[in-house]
């Protein structure tokens, strides 16, 4: 098992040819490692210009070095970010040098894990980081950014505070009936009912967030040759499905996604549904897949 608080490092930009690459170091040895490989003295929370050098003082690259003192950093620890030129050869050379000086490669998501363990973010914000990285539309990015900023966290904390206050009032009235005003049962029931509505709202918003993040599944369903594939191609604005006058041309489900005003719509073309006894084995399997598509759809568009 890895030590949760040793010093870790990773390339945090795509490893491909580009103008800039970024390497992050996080942990108590971050600054010491940076001092060993950076050509100049550096200041915390300043933009520092210089060179990365190896043990023989040979220059590897001209870089910008950004040190962040914990807990005011992404992970809550001492952090150093090194902006290099975007050559994979250069980036890997610097990463290897950092490892030689005592850091280890971070596991997937470990910087965010440390931010969570150091109470920089809560679980909802940690999940929002991944949602933001994987967002496929403006709406999903906005939703993730809202949660990263603490919207869901604040909603839950406010709800928790109110429920604890209600609980404390009830317990105090039971344990100290002579010293505490009697609790109005109707008042408590009314407050609890309001809180249940707030919980339902949070749960409904979570379901809506799933639609925003993963898209809405819309299946085109109907008998063979009613125009499902033609409509599918029209919606996509290019010929994705094969269209012929022959019944049963579409044998399997075909899924394509479009971005409609910031929302993802997953259009699903399906095999025509008809009496299986009139279909061959391959078409029968396609019909079964169409039925599964119906069960997994958010919206079903029947064509006749």
Feature map (PLM): residue ranges:
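Short, surface-exposed connector motifs at secondary-structure boundaries
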Residues: 78-79, 298-300
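Short secondary-structure transition/capping segments
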Residues: 97, 152-163, 218, 222, ...
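Long, non-coiled-coil amphipathic alpha-helical linker/lever segments
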Residues: 120-198
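Glycine/charge-rich, flexible interdomain linkers and switch-proximal surface loops
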Residues: 109-117, 147, 151, 207-222
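Conserved beta-strand segments of the P-loop GTPase G domain that flank and frequently precede/overlap
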Residues: 302-304
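A short linear-motif detector with a strong N-terminal bias
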Residues: 1-4, 30-31, 44-45, 60-62, ...
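A glycine-rich (often HGG/GG-containing) alpha/beta subdomain
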Residues: 1-142, 146, 161
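Conserved G1/Walker A P-loop phosphate-binding module
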Residues: 6-7, 17, 24-25, 37-39, ...
């Amino acid at each position: 098992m890895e030590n949760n608080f040793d010093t870790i490092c990773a390339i945090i930009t795509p490893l491909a040819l580009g103008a800039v690459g970024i390497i992050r170091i996080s942990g108590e040895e971050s600054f010491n490692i940076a001092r060993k490989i950076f050509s100049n003295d550096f200041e915390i929370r300043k933009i520092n210009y210089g060179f990365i050098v190896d043990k023989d003082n040979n220059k590897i690259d001209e870089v910008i070095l950004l040190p962040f003192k914990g807990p005011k950093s992404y992970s809550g620890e001492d952090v150093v970010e090194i902006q290099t030129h975007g050559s994979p050869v250069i980036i890997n050379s610097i990463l290897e040098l950092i490892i030689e000086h005592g850091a280890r490669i971070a596991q997937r998501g470990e910087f965010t894990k440390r931010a969570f363990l150091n109470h920089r973010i809560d679980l909802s914000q940690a999940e929002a980081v991944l949602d933001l990285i994987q967002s496929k539309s403006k709406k999903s990015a906005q939703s993730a950014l809202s949660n990263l900023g603490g919207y869901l966290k604040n909603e839950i904390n406010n709800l928790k505070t109110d429920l604890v206050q209600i609980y404390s009032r009830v317990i105090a009235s039971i344990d100290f009936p002579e010293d505490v005003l009697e609790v109005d049962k109707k008042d408590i029931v009314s407050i609890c009912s309001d809180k249940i509505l707030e919980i339902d709202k949070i749960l409904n918003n979570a379901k809506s967030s799933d639609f925003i993040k993963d898209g809405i599944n819309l299946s085109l369903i109907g008998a063979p040759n009613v125009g499902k594939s033609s409509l599918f191609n029209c919606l996509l604005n290019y010929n994705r499905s094969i269209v012929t006058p022959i019944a049963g041309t579409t044998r399997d489900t075909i899924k394509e996604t479009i971005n409609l005003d910031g929302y993802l719509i997953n259009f699903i073309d399906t095999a025509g549904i008809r009496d299986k006894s009139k279909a061959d084995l391959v078409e029968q399997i396609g019909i079964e897949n169409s039925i599964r598509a119906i069960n997994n759809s958010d919206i079903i568009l029947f064509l006749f």
